[in-house]
């Protein structure tokens, strides 16, 4: 599946914030989830919303706070996708 440029950049930027020993599994799980989300919407391309949604679905709830801080620092607007709580 194709990824649009912003989605790929966001994915790589967030992934870079994840500890090295977890990065491999996070990369696999989040990429797979993002592609599933895009397919479920009958799209041929992963968009930034899919990436954000995938990170929230695949990241344990206890780590959402630090992940949100990382997204804020990167300028990724997760709140516009409904993840403001």
Language-model features: locations:
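Non-catalytic accessory segments flanking P-loop/AAA+ NTPase cores
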Residues: 1-85
């Amino acid at each position: 599946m194709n990824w649009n440029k912003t989605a790929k950049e966001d994915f790589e930027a967030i992934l870079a914030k994840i500890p090295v020993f977890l990065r491999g599994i996070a990369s696999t799980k989040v990429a797979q989830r993002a592609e599933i989300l895009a397919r479920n919407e009958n799209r041929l391309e992963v968009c930034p919303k899919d990436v954000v949604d995938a990170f929230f679905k695949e990241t344990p709830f206890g780590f959402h706070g630090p992940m949100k801080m990382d997204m804020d620092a990167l300028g990724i607007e997760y709140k516009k996708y409904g993840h403001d709580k």
